[in-house]
Amino acid sequence: MKKFLLTITGLFCILIAFSQSHQRPPAAVQKSFQNDYPQSKSGQWSHSNGSWNVSFTDKDHNNGEVTAHFNDNGDHTDTHVPYDRNDVPAPVTDKVKSNYSGYSKADFTRIDQAGGNSVYQVNLKNKNAHKTVYMDERGNETKYKASHR
């Protein structure tokens, strides 16, 4: 019985160690985050599909919740910043009004990509459907492939 309890305890400790290690990004990722967001404290880290993701409050974005993505080498791939409808460029909101009037709700997120390009992710909702579209700042629909997936 004593061996059994020791074995179970050991396995439990190993599981905890491995699960915790996956939530701590490598030093290169932490350093990139600190360089890119020196005024922000790192928040909740997660790791999926080869990408380290951190959600945090950023002073540069009106203390809003921001999510930044880094690859395993510490390269900053993109940043997701939720936007109020009033802060989104007019061509984007105009296009949503004209092309998606059947949707009762639209949430906007600006995605700043590493190369300097930005796209707006528009999550549209109504009673029966959800749809996500991507637009550039001129309101043109575009394809977006997340570099962190």
Model-derived features: where do they sit?
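Bacterial Sec-dependent N-terminal signal peptides
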Residues: 1-24, 33
